Amino acid sequence: MKKNNSFLDRLFMALVFVFLYAPIVLLIVFSFNSGNSNMVWKGFSLHWYTKLFRNRIIMQSVYTTLLVSLLATIIATVAGTFAAIGFYAMRRRVRNPLMTVNNIPMMNADVVTGVSMCLLFVAFFSGWGSFASWFNTLGLFRLPTHLTMGFGTLLIAHITFNIPYVILSVGPKLRQMDRNLVDAAMDLGCTWMQAFWKVIIPEIKPGIVSGALTAFTMSIDDFVISYFTAGSSSSTLAMTIYGMTKKKVTPEINAISTLLFVTVLVLLAVINVREARQERKLAAEQRR
């Protein structure tokens, strides 16, 4: 009876994985198809990848995606690390409610976050013209009187939804750190800044790296929030793919999606490997 149950469990899991990953496998396979069809295999070819890298619109969206992701990751990692340290220094009754607020953007629906940020930018830009006109009358220097959504709003949106992930990654490393290390460093003559760079940063470095990789992955993979905050002058890779699918799903789209999938998969694998090594290292230290 137990063997039958075990077989059924494995069969069920296999069917679940087939259901989840069969479309992705087909997408990857037909990205190498020499023909235009997504149903009939004509032979192996790199034609669609070659065509992909010659497409100016796609390359521009790749450049925008990478630039936004890198800048958002750097800024969110710095801001999130300092925020996590600030939370760590607070009393528990103050820290716990703030951590709950920090977790809301991660649990909130992306469409709600995207629409709310879009409305925020629209409200800000509507009042900016009057302020800029008044400021320009002072004669100090001139401010632009007309602002629109574009690369700047897209970057701000990505920074905003990435910071909570960094805080969530750095926080546990701070709780594992011995508070006495900082006091000991300062007793030995270190300033607070020296203790920060020589004691705190090395202790929480794994959390910072994991948070940065997670933020970069989330930025590359984001579509909904970017769609509502990019305006008409900027387009990420996910937005470009969405626009292309409205016309026709070609092997060129398969090639883009394959590259995006592989990129995210590699980043997630790096994150998981790092976390597994950290857990083994921590377990080894506890056994000593």
Language-model regions, residue ranges each:
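Transmembrane-helix boundary motif in ABC transporter permease subunits
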Residues: M1-S6, L71-N102, V115, L119-A123, ...
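Short membrane-interfacial helix/loop motifs at transmembrane-helix boundaries
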Residues: A22-R56, Y227-S232, R288
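Membrane-interfacial helix termini and adjacent extracytoplasmic/periplasmic loops
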Residues: S37-N38, L46, V111-I159, M193, ...
